[in-house]
Amino acid sequence: MKREEHVFNETFSYRYPGKDADHAILIQHGIASHGGIYDSFCAHHASHGVDVWSMDAPGHGRSVNMRPPGRFSIEEWVDDAVALGEHIGETTGLPVFIKGSSLGAAAAYCALQASDVFLGAILMGYAIPSSPLVPNPNPFRSEAFEQIDALFGDKLLLSLDRFINFDEDYGYVGASEQKKADPLNTWYYELRAFASFFRYDPVVPLSQNTKPIFYTVGERDTTFGPDVAKMVADATAGPVELYVHPDGMHQLMLSHTVAYSDVVLEWCRRQAK
């Protein structure tokens, strides 16, 4: 499978051009990561007639330009995903879906609501603005946080390898060490970048959604789990489906590539009919 490298505006993205593709999918990676970590899934998925794109979020991977890694906001992330999604739609003429992995599900949902280019969203994460996991109000919307941010600004950093146990998140011992060997991963977020997820209001909250959403979760996901997934799915209006992958871990694209690809493929083609 051929992997192309694209730069659109300031967004770096990989493209896996599937032969005779009948739809496209734009992937949003999770916390600390970049678009290239899903090579195996993307190549396999593209081989089944999908035009697959996997972008680096702003402040991640190679979408850093004149900024340090970890400096971004969810507003920027959503804008970049929408711009690239519209570019994909215009240049390919294909229906476009957006897929969010873990933290990337927040950006994916918000992008889905910010543009009509996306036919639907596959969300493999649940810390989504307007969901029960990201309530309003919350401490990041407080006057106290604004005072702290005004005082310290970009000097306050969140250590991601302390915040997340990647061995548990990825489902195997050694995952954290392996991630640290990849120079494109990001190990610190500016606290204001992380806070932006809790301060953001999507164009349409989950409770008023009208677009197709496919929630997916591993049966043994230690980060969210089926109960959390059901809680968020139940709080979402509109055409929503929830899929629990048997014996699945958190990173379904990485640890259950073939079987999970089949599930995503079937749902997307059903929506595109």
Put a short name on every predicted segment.
Residues 248-261:
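Catalytic histidine-centered segment of alpha/beta-hydrolase-like enzymes
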Residues 222-228:
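Conserved alpha/beta-hydrolase "acid-adjacent" motif
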Residues 121-150:
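Flexible "cap/lid" loop of the alpha/beta hydrolase fold
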Residues 209, 215-217, 221:
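Short beta-strand/loop motif that positions the catalytic acidic residue
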